[in-house]
Amino acid sequence: DNYTVRLIQKDLPCSVVFYLGRGDRPYRPTSISLPYNTSISLLSDHFTVQCNDLLKRTSLPTVPYISIRYDENVRQRLATTKKNPDNFNILILGLDSVSRMQFERMLPKTFAYITKELDGIILKGYNILGDGTPAQIIPILTGMQERELPSTLHRDKNGSFVDVYPFIWNQYRERGYVTGYAEDGPSMGIWTLRLRGFNRTPTDHYMTP
């Protein structure tokens, strides 16, 4: 809690491994021992915990976690941004490889939670503008199709990183918002499978180490 991780169980020494880096470059694991009843500040939004059971003399499975680290730059931005009661918290949720109608049929509880509990808006008129996941997501996040943007392909030796795209979160950041981006499968990432990925971390909180 409070941007820290704490060990509250005896006879269970643990190590926390933070993953430091930027953009889609290889991340550097940094391990820190976590003694009983102590806490350490989060160094990254994503980390793993490895513990040893001294009584059973066994190692427990490594557990991954996602949290929000303290970021002074973000705090300064929030402190200097004029508060507007009309501003919304905005979450864009995309599900790949499934149509809207199939989503409603196959995941009715999830659909009901999004539409009723969260009062979410379903983009009924949204259509893919090409083939593949990038053709699904690039237009809604940039307002342009991939062919209208600078080349970011791996095979293009003069290609740019996808940082050059006019992502909508850049505009939100300029207006004082805290931004974030996450994918469930970074090994097959939208921006890295056939594109060059990000050179710099694109959002305040980037959940794809």
Where do the model's predicted regions map?
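Beta-strand-enriched, solvent-exposed domains that form extended recognition/catalytic surfaces
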Residues: 1-81
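Active-site-proximal alpha/beta segments of enzymes that process anionic O-linked groups
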Residues: 44, 74-78, 82-209
